[in-house]
Each structure stands twice: as structure tokens, then as C-alpha cells.
A protein has these predicted regions:
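Low-complexity, Pro/Ser/Thr- and charge-rich linker/hinge segments at domain boundaries
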Residues: 119-145
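Residue-identity detector for glutamine
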Residues: 6-8, 129, 133, 155, ...
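Short peripheral tails and domain-boundary helices/loops at the edges of structured domains
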Residues: 106-115, 126-128
């Protein structure tokens, strides 16, 4: 029996558009069709995670992980589903404006095979800045800027406050 028949995996994003530096949350849903409980964990021989993400920008360039993502073992009862939500902003540079595509790779242990979820698309924008104010002492190098941005979608308008260290741009 193939791993594809044993586990069904889908990927979804918490939304389609994000403001730069806000959490980009991806959710992987795994359904166990194997007829027995499954324990999915990192491969002890290769130290590969059981879950990885592949993200490409609009030019088709793969984004390299900025940090390792470590996921503990997951038990999926027979006939049941589990969902794992992951904030991708800590592991990938998805803070710059642009359009991205993402898919998840699931590795079953003990040679159970690898498979890939559906591809989802999301974009990151700066929003429209409507106000900014610098505060602090330039002589001491501790100037910060408060920025107010609006982001509109067909469903709603959102107001964001950004606090930026002028020295670092962060």
C-alpha cells in the first residue's frame, strides 16, 4: 500500500494576503487512511524533519530556510485527522512584498515514503502608509518611527501599527 493511500495531506493558509512582518500561518492537515494508528516522526538515520515547506517567490526562486524548524512526533489515530499550524515568518524570508507559492513535504518514517501537498499561493504587501512619526534622541541613536498603514481587501479594512528602529530598519 502506498504512502499516498495511507495519509492524505492538504495545505491551507490562514489568509491570502499578509502585511509585511505579520505571521504567515500555514496549516497542514493530515488524514490517516491506513487502518491503524500512525506515528510520524523525524527520521533518526538522516535527522530529516517529517515536515518541511518549499516556498518560491514570483520569479520561481526557492527561499532557503533562515532557521531550522523542528517538529515533535505526531500520532494520528486510524481514520482521524490532525492539523499542524506553522508560522513561516520565523523560518523563511516572507516579510518582503511579493507573491509566493508554498507546498509542504511530509516524510513517513522507516522508508514509508515522501509526498507533497497541494500548492497554495499568498502575497505580502506593505499596505498603504497613512501616517508616520519619528520619536527619540538622534544624538543617542535611539530614533524610532511609528507608522500607521491601512490594508484593504474586499471583505474588510485593517489598520496596522509598525514600530521601526531607524538605525536598523527593523
Amino acid at each position: 500500500e502506498s504512502s499516498h493511500a495511507q495519509v492524505q495531506a492538504t495545505l491551507s493558509m490562514s489568509k491570502k494576503e499578509y502585511i509585511a512582518h505579520e505571521p504567515v500561518v500555514a496549516t497542514v492537515t493530515l488524514t490517516n487512511n491506513a487502518g491503524r494508528d500512525l506515528l510520524i516522526h523525524a527520521d533518526d538515520r538522516t535527522t530529516l524533519n517529517w515536515l518541511d515547506f518549499e516556498i518560491k517567490n514570483s520569479r520561481g526562486t526557492s527561499l532557503s530556510p533562515l532557521a531550522a524548524m523542528n517538529f515533535g512526533p505526531v500520532r494520528i489515530p486510524a481514520g482521524r485527522s490532525i492539523a499542524k499550524s506553522v508560522d513561516l515568518t520565523g523560518a523563511f524570508r516572507v516579510t518582503e512584498p511579493g507573491r509566493f507559492r508554498c507546498k509542504a513535504v511530509i516524510r513517513l518514517p522507516e522508508g514509508g515514503g515522501n509526498f507533497v501537498t497541494n500548492t497554495t499561493y499568498f502575497s505580502v504587501t506593505l499596505g498603504r502608509q497613512v501616517y508616520s512619526q519619528r520619536v527619540g534622541d538622534p544624538g543617542r541613536g535611539d530614533v524610532r518611527e511609528y507608522r500607521l498603514s491601512i490594508h484593504k481587501t474586499p471583505q474588510k479594512s485593517s489598520l496596522y501599527v509598525h514600530l521601526v528602529d531607524i538605525r536598523t530598519g527593523q
